[in-house]
Swiss-Prot record:
This is Homeobox protein Hox-D4b. Residues 13-92, 213-249 are annotated as: Disordered. Belongs to the Antp homeobox family. Deformed subfamily. Gene3D superfamilies: Homeodomain-like. It is found in: Nucleus. Its main location: nucleus. Keywords: Developmental protein, DNA-binding, Homeobox, Nucleus, Transcription, Transcription regulation.
Length: 249
């Protein structure tokens, strides 16, 4: 930890060379010095070397200080050099600008280099001005004629809708798959082509009539009318014949 600063007055303690003392061990009665255990071998074990002299501590120049004095000196050094004890500390100059240390600059450079090229490319792309969205003519809702509400006199007739080529192409695709649209699909098509639901409905009605005409199919409306007229004629003819038969009888 860099926050802990060692005092310059601290002297490393000096100790004498380490020597093993076996005097206490022999007094306690070790395994080899016990005559009772080694009696079967013809006598106790006698040490060849004399025991070493007792340890006498030497006087050294090191005088241990109290913990409070050491903490006090550390606090004074931290107050004099705050940047050494706190790496992230930034000194503020008189002008108000912060001075960044070399470690902070290296950290910022590493973070910029660590980014992948894809992330850097995205940042650059977001910074540029976005290109304007292209609006094609068929996307503009200008095909519906507006009726002037302040027009004097009777209400004018509804004007025809001028469908664009793109709208007609999309409607033809829908008609190719299904000649009858559901309500949900009709709303989706109207929203996609910037049309009203009624305009899509009318276009499909007209397209079905043209399709029947091209395939020479009888008109359902005309056939129902003709059926009604034929039924009425048959009824009238049947009533006339019954009246004639009654007169002849």
């Amino acid at each position: 930890m860099e926050s802990y600063v060692m005092s310059c007055k601290y002297a490393e303690p000096q100790f004498p060379p380490c020597e093993e003392d076996y005097s206490n061990f022999s007094d306690q009665g070790g395994y080899y010095n016990n005559p009772q255990d080694s009696g079967s071998y013809g006598g106790g074990y006698q040490s060849v070397q004399p025991p070493p002299p007792p340890y006498a501590p030497q006087q050294s120049s090191y005088h241990p200080r109290s913990v409070q004095e050491q903490h006090r000196e550390d606090a004074e050094e931290r107050a004099q050099h705050p940047a050494a004890s706190f790496p992230g500390y930034r000194e503020v100059d008189a002008s108000g600008k912060q001075g960044y240390s070399a470690g902070d600059l290296q950290c910022q450079a590493w973070m910029t280099c660590a980014k992948s090229p894809q992330v850097q490319r995205k940042v650059v792309c977001h910074g540029k001005d976005k290109s304007p969205i292209v609006v094609y003519p068929w996307m503009k809702k200008v095909h519906v004629a507006q009726v002037n509400p302040n027009h004097p006199g009777p209400e004018p007739k509804r004007l025809r809708t001028a469908y664009t080529r793109q709208q007609v192409l999309e409607l033809e695709k829908e008609f190719h798959f299904s000649r009858y649209l559901t309500r949900r699909r009709r709303v989706e098509v109207a929203h996609t082509l910037c049309l009203s639901e009624r305009q899509v409905k009318v276009w499909f009605q007209n397209r079905r009539m043209r399709w029947k005409k091209d395939h020479k199919l009888p008109n359902t409306k005309g056939r129902s009318k003709n059926k009604k007229t034929t039924d009425s004629n048959n009824n009238n003819s049947g009533g006339a014949t019954s009246v004639k038969a009654a007169i002849t009888v």
